[in-house]
Design a protein with these regions (language model features):
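Short, polar loop motifs at secondary-structure junctions
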Residues: 9-11, 76-83, 126-131
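Active-site HxH/HxHxD metal-binding segment of metal-dependent hydrolases
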Residues: 35-95
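Binuclear metal-ion centers of metallo-dependent hydrolases, dominated by the metallo-beta-lactamase
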Residues: 85-96, 103, 154, 164-209
């Protein structure tokens, strides 16, 4: 099966598989990027949101995506479901297979509810977590965050052993920083036969699984 993944900044991915378009974590960093054209998310069938932090959900971006969608359902945590209801956006807490992926501790205290998603048996997105024990063949993996590290991310990927790792959560890095960090990640993952697939912002890659 072919899977096309478009990176729309930071943790936001547009995944196209099985004739469906799934938007994951449409956050503020994406919405504020002047390169984002709303038509990029035309016709999405599902919107999956791992948790409530602004870098993973922008109400403005979400509302725009829904207006341009094929009647897309929004799937998220109970906590964010309640928040979105205050903005007159309906969300559900089931549908797409989920997996346990607790939010890592952040400098200001515990993180919010966080859920991982398995998309159509091909790709897993853990949100803000390195504490999960399962994945599909493609893993969207955070490597740069206030709550984690490149070492933790690489160790977790080597534990769960996907076929491909797509780095996410990297708005915090400069261009040179990404090059350096992902070179190290590739060296670590190559030892276990895991291919690191770096996708630049607003570019797409098609993988076969």
């Amino acid at each position: 099966m072919d899977v096309t993944i478009t990176k729309l900044v930071h943790a936001c991915l547009l995944v196209e598989t099985g004739g469906k378009r799934i938007l994951i974590d449409p956050g503020t960093f994406s919405w504020q990027d002047e390169r984002l054209d709303p038509s990029m998310v035309d016709g999405v069938d599902r919107v999956l949101i791992t948790h409530e932090h602004a870098d993973h959900v922008s109400v403005e971006f979400l509302r725009t995506a829904l207006e341009r969608s094929n009647g897309a359902a929004v799937e998220t945590t109970p906590a964010l479901q309640a928040i979105l209801a205050e903005h007159d956006i309906n969300a559900v807490t089931d549908g797409t297979p989920q997996f346990a992926a607790p939010h890592e501790r952040i400098p200001i205290g515990p993180g919010p509810q966080n859920v991982g998603f398995h998309i159509d048996g091909v790709l897993s997105h853990p949100g803000d977590s390195h504490s999960f024990v399962e994945t599909m063949p493609i893993l969207a993996m955070p490597f740069a965050a206030p709550w984690g590290s490149l070492t933790n991310g690489a160790d977790r990927a080597r534990l769960v052993r996907p076929r491909y790792v797509v780095p996410i959560q990297d708005w915090f890095l400069s261009g040179g920083g990404r090059t350096f960090m992902y070179r190290l990640a590739k060296m670590a993952l190559d030892k276990d036969g895991i291919e690191l697939v770096q996708i630049e912002d607003f570019e797409s890659v098609t993988l076969s699984v």
